A protein has these predicted regions:
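Hydrophobic/aromatic-rich transmembrane helices and adjacent perimembrane loops
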Residues: 34-40, 339-387
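Membrane-lumen/periplasm interface segments of specific transmembrane helices
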Residues: 78, 92, 102-103, 249-333, ...
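Transmembrane-helix motifs of polytopic, lipid-linked glycan transferases
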Residues: 142-166, 205
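Short helix- or helix-capping micro-motifs
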Residues: 172-183, 222, 226
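Extracytosolic helix-loop segments that constitute the early lumenal/periplasmic catalytic or substrate-binding loops
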Residues: 77, 95-118, 125-126
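Specific aromatic-rich, kink-prone transmembrane helix
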Residues: 157-160, 178, 189, 197-222, ...
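Signature aromatic-anchored transmembrane alpha helix within multi-pass, membrane-resident enzymes
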Residues: 13, 64-69, 170, 257-261, ...
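Start-transfer (signal-anchor) and selected internal transmembrane alpha helices
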Residues: 2-76, 163, 249-252
Length: 520
């Protein structure tokens, strides 16, 4: 006993030293505190296993509410400071800022990133719901705050689902916390803004409504899910599978899946091509299985070995592990609930684009709600077969795995990441000089800040239409833009294009390496 106590004290000392080092890394310029954080998590876990630490008695529901508010505030801070420090992008934050601004200005869902009707790329009529906010506070910050609040509001839904299934308020609060700690959720939140991710809270509350017998509310939430993006229909098909397999509501499940499939078919076959003037472009990611939705479905049914050979890769295995580990692999014990994730998982795993099967991208929005529900169901089955301590141990493992896999988020709190440096401040001074009505072609980091206008492009796209350019001269020569040249003689600047065209500009403003040009 004395030896265990001595070891516990030694681990306490190590944890204290790591904590001090972590605080130092947060204030040190350009340090990455995530490694120290992982070490601290592992040491505290080992310390708890050796001699359990006292856990204060807290009201589970109040804890969930506080955690929900804290998540919304923390991630609003992270995403806003990332944006202010030029770490957001034209695609997709700038794109959606421009779309919603155009809608709020009476121009309809138009964009110039690329220049087209927005519904010709992705069909997201849910964006109309954000228009009133843009009448009051237009801009990127509005979208980032809405996204953080939306994700946070999924936690109370998880609490209600878990309390109903587990009949344990404490475990329900742990699952709500587990949801908020999920690395996929956090990854989606910091990757600019995407209307598709609103599916996460919408589906979680649809589960709550379905289990409470609130059919009309459930249907409304599913309609909003369908409105988030055309391929969100896959999540609603999955919801239908869950109704049928998990709740034995065969007719309701079949009807839900059938309606969702019809919407997906109509959107990709007729609606989006009508706005685009050509076939639905995103099916190109599945060229190995055919050129249409029907071809892909037939490949799954008729050539399963070919499909398996395509998806049996190391990257996809890592993706599966990264999605399951933060939930303690509990979803594997909830097969009926996990079945709902299959349509969206198929979309991700069959794609030739690796971004779809990366666990921190927005493409997990259609998968994560089902994994969380399946984890709760898996915990309920585990409690029925094993002692309560065993189930709580699995949840504790899931929390540790979530903290480790989310450790990179701690880097966002390092002072150099959120406190603007001299270059960031110079950029904002130059961006303030861009005329509000100017047609602008700018390098990527500037675009999301300047998207409240009809025409904004990512340089050198749109240079023939733009009357202003905004460039970061320290990045010249532009290795990713072969053939695009820049020559300067005093206040005169010439931009040369690969096809021989030359555009002449005058310097409108410059601060450090941030250069604003006005066409002569």
């Amino acid at each position: 006993m004395t030896g265990r106590r001595a070891l516990a004290r030694a681990l306490d000392a190590i944890a204290a030293l790591l904590g001090v080092g972590l605080l130092g890394a947060l204030v040190s310029p350009y340090a990455r505190p995530e490694g120290l954080f992982v070490a601290l998590v592992l040491v505290v876990t080992l310390r708890h296993l050796l001699n359990p630490l006292p856990i204060p008695a807290l009201d589970p529901w109040r804890t969930t509410v506080v955690a929900t508010g804290a998540y919304a505030a923390i991630f609003a801070f992270i995403t806003i400071t990332r944006h202010l420090n030029l770490m957001t992008h034209a695609l997709d934050l700038g794109q959606y800022v421009q779309i919603v601004w155009n809608m709020a200005s009476g121009y309809g869902p138009r964009m110039s990133l690329p220049e087209m009707h927005a519904w010709g790329d992705h069909l997201s009529p849910i964006l109309w719901g954000l228009v009133p906010l843009f009448w009051i506070v237009p801009g990127p910050v509005t979208l980032l705050v809405v996204q953080s609040i939306a994700f946070a509001l999924g936690a109370p839904a998880v609490y209600l689902l878990a309390r109903r299934r587990l009949e344990d308020d404490g475990l329900a609060a742990l699952f709500a916390l587990l949801y908020l700690l999920n690395p996929s959720l956090q990854g989606m939140n910091v990757r600019d803004f995407h209307p598709a991710v609103l599916v996460v809270p919408l589906l979680l509350w649809a589960f709550v409504a379905a289990e409470a017998g609130r059919a009309l509310l459930c249907a409304g939430l599913l309609v909003l899910t369908l409105a988030s993006r055309e391929d969100a229909a896959l999540a609603v098909i999955g919801f239908g599978l869950w109704l049928a397999l998990g709740r034995r509501q065969w007719l309701a499940g079949a009807a839900t899946a059938a309606v969702a499939f019809a919407v997906l078919w109509a959107d990709t076959r007729w609606v989006i091509p009508a706005f685009r003037g050509e076939p639905y472009s995103h099916l190109r990611r599945y060229a190995a299985f055919g050129g249409s939705l029907l071809d892909i479905m037939l490949a799954l049914l008729l050539h399963p070995l070919h499909v398996l050979a395509q998806i049996a890769t190391r990257g996809r295995l890592v993706y599966a592990l990264a999605m399951l580990a933060p939930l303690g692999f509990l979803p594997l014990l909830g097969p009926a609930e996990l079945a709902g994730a299959l349509p969206a998982l198929a979309q991700n795993l069959l794609s030739r684009d690796p971004i779809l099967y990366h666990h921190r991208t927005q493409y997990q929005a259609f998968v994560l709600p089902f994994l969380v529900l399946a984890a709760v169901a898996g915990a309920a089955r585990l409690l029925a077969r094993r002692p309560e301590r065993f189930a709580k141990g699995v949840v504790a493992f899931a929390i540790v795995a979530s903290l480790v896999l989310s450790s990179r988020m701690l880097n966002e709190f390092a002072i150099y990441r959120w406190w603007p440096d001299a270059s960031d401040r110079a950029a904002h001074r130059v961006m303030a000089r861009v005329p509000a009505a100017a047609a602008l072609s700018a390098q990527d980091p500037y675009v999301a800040h300047l998207s409240l206008r009809p025409l904004v492009f990512v340089f050198p796209v749109g240079i023939e239409k733009a009357d202003h350019l905004l460039l970061y001269t320290a990045s010249y020569p532009w290795r990713d833009l072969p053939g695009v040249t820049m020559g300067r003689d005093g206040e005169d600047v010439v931009i040369g294009m690969p096809d021989g065209r030359r555009y002449r500009y005058a310097v409108a403003a410059q601060d450090g390496h941030h250069l604003l040009l006005r066409r002569r």
